C-alpha cells in the first residue's frame, strides 16, 4: 500500500534535524491571535496543552484518532474531550472559546498501515506510523481550513518521544506550507499538570494509548506485575 509521502519521510529521515528560532510569546500582543489546529489524542492530554497555548492562539482541537479501534472506547474519549471543552469554555466565556472538530474515524486505513507491525513494542515502528498518520492528517486539515499553525497534544505524554514528533512536524511544515508549532508539552511539568486538571474536571483517564495492540500489552504487563 502506498503511504503518504510524509509518513515515508518520517521513517526514512530519522536523523532529520531542524531548529526553530521562532518566538511565539508575542502572539497575544497582535491585534488578532494566530489560529492553531491542535491535534487532540484525548481529553486528559488536552487539558494542560490548551491551558499552555490558549492565551496566544485561537485554538481548535482536532479529534482524529483512528488508532482507537474499539468504537466504544473511541466514543468515550471523544465525549471526555467535549466534557473538558464545554467546561473550560464555560469558565472562560469572557476571555476566549476553544473550538472542536472531529476527523474521519477511518479505522481500516489505520489497520492497513499497522497490521504488519502488530508485534512491535510500544514506541517502535508501529507508533511511528501512527504518529505520522495522525499528524499528517492534522497538517492537511490545517492547510485546507487555513489555520496558521498546527501541532499535537501527544507530546505531553512522558512515553512519547518529542524528537520524533518534532521531526515529523517539520517535514509536514515543508510539505504543506503551514507552520508547525514547535512545543514539547511535557516540559514545564506539563504531564503532571494534565493529571491535576483531569482530576479537577472529573475526566475519564484511559489506561492505554489507544490501539488494541497497546491495550493487550498493558493488560499483559499488569498481569505480570501481580
Segments from the language model and where they lie:
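Nucleotide-activated chemistry modules centered on ATP-dependent adenylation/adenylyltransferase
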Residues: 2-51, 56-226
Amino acid at each position: 500500500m502506498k503511504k503518504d509521502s510524509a509518513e515515508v519521510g518520517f521513517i526514512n529521515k530519522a536523523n532529520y534535524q531542524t531548529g526553530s528560532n521562532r518566538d511565539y510569546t508575542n502572539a497575544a500582543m497582535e491585534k488578532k491571535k494566530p489560529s492553531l489546529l491542535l491535534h487532540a489524542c484525548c481529553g486528559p492530554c488536552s487539558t494542560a496543552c490548551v491551558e499552555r497555548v490558549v492565551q496566544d492562539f485561537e485554538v481548535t482541537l482536532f479529534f482524529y484518532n483512528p488508532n482507537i479501534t474499539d468504537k466504544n472506547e473511541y466514543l468515550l474519549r471523544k465525549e471526555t474531550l467535549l466534557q473538558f471543552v464545554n467546561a473550560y469554555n464555560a469558565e472562560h466565556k469572557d476571555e476566549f472559546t476553544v473550538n472542536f472538530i472531529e476527523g474521519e474515524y477511518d479505522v481500516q486505513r489505520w489497520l492497513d498501515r499497522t497490521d504488519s507491525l502488530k508485534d512491535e513494542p510500544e514506541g517502535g515502528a508501529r507508533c511511528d506510523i501512527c504518529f505520522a498518520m495522525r499528524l499528517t492528517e492534522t497538517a492537511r486539515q490545517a492547510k485546507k481550513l487555513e489555520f496558521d499553525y498546527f501541532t499535537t497534544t501527544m507530546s505531553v505524554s512522558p512515553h512519547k518521544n518529542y524528537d520524533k514528533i518534532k521531526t515529523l512536524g517539520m517535514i509536514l511544515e515543508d510539505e504543506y506550507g503551514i507552520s508547525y508549532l514547535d512545543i514539547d508539552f511535557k516540559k514545564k511539568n506539563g504531564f503532571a499538570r494534565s493529571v491535576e486538571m483531569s482530576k479537577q474536571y472529573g475526566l475519564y483517564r484511559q489506561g492505554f494509548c489507544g490501539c488494541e495492540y497497546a491495550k493487550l500489552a498493558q493488560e499483559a504487563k499488569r498481569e505480570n506485575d501481580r
